[in-house]
């Protein structure tokens, strides 16, 4: 790969590092190896007793991690292929297949998790935790703390099985729908008004940062018109996902509130998060003052929703267009100024061709960094359109990738950063 980043163009990622060909015999053998390891792990149920040795306990954790890594590789390939083209029936079918496999494997090894959470006594659990390598200890302590929210093995299996065709299926339907949306905006072109068609939301939303107020308004109206037209179906998707979340978390598991589920998963207590929210509510006037001042700088009596992201002048950064190559070069130089290792790690992502940066129809919108396993270079999805916010998004997602690579010596069980840290 060339090191002349200034000439780099947007492109697609290469996910063959994960799976060369999902229809090949090699991939079938890979999935078969997962089945063999799961069967071996299932045999460990008979040796789970309070006085199990810490060596045996650690061996089981390592077996479980090995199974999880293989599932992550197969699932990662399926998801990344689907995000690159949500209209692909082949990609969608593979996602369903991998989700079903992951659910089945999870159900078959679930007994170990529930045993450690609920069946072993406090003294023996503490003995095992203190003898295990230090990187696992906090994770295992947290499992014991949240044990009261676990259900019986059979109940957990039912929930896991139904998720594949329940909330996860609804999310895929949402992605397929919204990624296929097409938009038409009425824009001024010289003295004429033209109807411009957009087959991707990302291109349309670039206009909300246009220095032209009419273009910003036209972009929002076009966006909202399409979503309003589909509000019935989208509303049903939202409602059903929310109801499923609440029914499981509150009615079945006994969490105090829906947000408590997320807080506890992030190892935070509700009081801490509520203090943060209370501080935001108390100081909401600061945001009001900001928008009043922005309205004044834009020469508007009132700042409408259409103009929240308006650049304050035609010379502002959001009015400037950046080539992809110059954006990459700017970010890499910034990383190097902070620490040469940051640049080196970011360059590895480009060298591996793990970036999908172009805007195209049916590709998932937004941006993310996807870390599959600790020993694999992360993947980054962008929708680069040349705005300053696209440059900052590039830097942001590569920051996640650098974080993942710096954590590559950690085991999969504790490798991923929790949301508050990420």
Language-model regions: role of each:
Residues 1-316:
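A well-structured
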Residues 343, 349-353, 422:
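Acidic/histidine-enriched, beta-strand-rich ligand/metal-binding domains
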Residues 393-397, 401, 405:
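Catalytic glutamate of the conserved HExxH
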Residues 404-422:
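Post-HEXXH active-site segment of zinc metalloproteases
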Residues 293, 297-340, 369, 380, ...:
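Long, K/E/R/D-enriched contiguous segments that form extended
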Residues 317-322, 356-376:
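Catalytic zinc-binding patch centered on the HExxH motif and its immediate surroundings
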Residues 62-65, 242-243, 350, 354-363:
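Conserved oxyanion/phosphate-binding beta-strand-loop segments in alpha/beta enzyme cores
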Residues 319-324, 375-395, 409:
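Short pre-active-site segment immediately N-terminal to the catalytic Zn-binding motif
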